[in-house]
Amino acid sequence: MSGVSRRRLLTATASAGALGALSACSANDWSVSGKGDANASAHKRPAKLIGDGSTADTGAQPGQPKAERLKPGERPPQFVVFSWDGAGELSNKLFSRFRTIAAEHDASMTFFLSGIYTLPESKKHLYRPPQHPVGASAIGYLSDRHIHATLQQIRAAWLEGHEIGTHFNGHFCGTDGVRRWSPAEWRSEIEQATRFVTEWKTNTGFTDLQPLPFDYRKELIGGRTPCLEGQANLLPTAAELGWKYDASSPGGLQIWPGKVQGGRIWDFPLQSIPFPGHSFQVLSMDYNLMANQSNANPLGDRAQYAAWRAQARDSYLAGFRRAYESNRAPFFIGNHFERWNGGIYMDAVEQAITRIATHDDVRMVSFRQLVQWLEAQDPAVLRKLRTLNPGQSPLGGWAEFLGTAASPSDTAAS
């Protein structure tokens, strides 16, 4: 693939943003709530400050659904997870835009926060990336005002029921990137990302912001690596840290998820989905759509924007329909807060959310909420669900297919 590299593209986007140039449905007893005043309705009990007061233990997260085990013969709900890499609030206010959209459609999402988005550039000497010079980063540091705005968004998002995961720090891709890191180096990167989030008050000097209302070391149960690279050596560290899932697989199919790393980590890959007008499929992420539409050029032919926007939206909807009308495999869509090709991919995601939300049995959830549901199920049922291929409906219908548990000889869920 030629054109602008993903690393250069994300660096340019974040740097421009730092300068200010860039600008569900519920079913049964699973009601994904993101409602109310994020600052007023959160928790009645007093917050217990942690460390320097950057974070606080405020109790159970609001707006969390109760995971119920499927009844024999019951059709699974259609889970859809929208996740966001980086999760910084720049002048384009995309973080706040999609919080609003989520609230309008009773959706929870996962925001993979880049740790250095809470670290001022004046303090970049505190970041010691593996195999790179002190303070180095392939993405730009945010301006102080954008760090301030990002912290506000992270606080509000969590109080609305969204998940805060990690996108790590420096976003190093390619031959000298994270694919070369050892498990020990991944641990260093994770510890630094966590420290930047839990010590933002010390590092920024901000005194007008409330603490993030969660213990990040407990909140953090998964992430997505830069450019979907380096998963093999991340997984041992993730398992040691007690993480529940990883979303860094370089690509998967629309089947029910299983576990990796000896059955300790749920594997949630981006998925190959139909690409309208083509015989091949595309990975369910904005960057991959752009790579195929404008050869990874974020300033492609403006005359094509309307057609590309519709194609991106229809690709997401085709992926959704394939799962919804067949095996009901959870559908994963990944994105960045970006304005590539005039912002068409943000519009495409918004349009997809709006249309998906009109369907029955749809639950737009975070990865954390999906983990909780999966772990509430009969393992035999999950094994049986994993025997269904992309686009394959259960023989005889759901009542017959899940009327009895899978036999031990069925495909294992791990």
Q: What is the role of each PLM region?
A:
Residues 50-163, 170-174, 203-236, 252-253, ...:
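Active-site beta->alpha N-cap acidic-glycine motif
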Residues 103-107, 159, 195-202, 239, ...:
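Sec-exported extracytoplasmic/periplasmic mature domains
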Residues 95, 99, 150-155, 187-197, ...:
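Generic structural signal for well-ordered alpha-helices
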Residues 21-40:
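C-terminal region of N-terminal signal peptides and the immediate post-cleavage residues
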Residues 175-192:
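Active-site cleft segment of glycoside hydrolase catalytic domains centered on the general acid/base Glu
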Residues 36, 40-55, 128-144, 209-327, ...:
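Active-site-adjacent pocket scaffolds in enzyme catalytic domains
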